[in-house]
Amino acid sequence: DLDHPTQALADALWLQERFPDGLQGRKIAVSWAYSPSYAKPLSVPQGLAMLLPRLGADVVVAHPPGYQLVDACLEAARSGAESAGGSFQLTDDMDAAFEGAHVVYPKSWGPYELMLQRVDANRSGDEARMAEIEQACLEQNSRYRDWICDERRMALTEGGDALYMHCLPADIGDEVTPGVMARHRFNVAREANKKVYVIMALLAAAKVPDLVERLSH
């Protein structure tokens, strides 16, 4: 649950296409968003946080209390920003993350500390504790239904309509409003398409020892 390399690389490829001059100085908001299915993995936001600052982007991760990312991933994000001239920040304000952003990536992820407790309870076969944790997760999640990518928040972004991204499938009506998704449906489809080429490239690199030499001829 620490990283999602193929998704992060596919997203980077899509961003490279959209911003051919590079990501230096581009603000990218990676934000938690509400979803009824609260237990989504942290791998996508953490993968983005660790990769995009290394490409020079100014990455802001926004989440409400209880949805922090893993410390090791945060350290990697900060280190990448320092080495590449990008920046990395955390905030508990979705509006602040969206303000002036060139790219927004709102999606749900699970409450890490509670999820760890659930793993321990499951390992010990403690069904009563599992039920308690489930209830705590649902109650915590329901407090933040207003964390949604909507028209008002998109209006805060650079030019009033930043590039919307999502790893798909998005929870329309919860993570993002139908109107925002309708405007960006073509873009998220093109984003998803990049994953095919990234995976093909990774397989080729793994299977062909002299790949660079072969491609140069």
Which residues does each predicted region cover?
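Adenosine-phosphate binding glycine-rich loop
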Residues: 159-217
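Short, conserved loop/helix-junction motifs that constitute active-site signature segments
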Residues: 22-23, 53, 151-161, 183
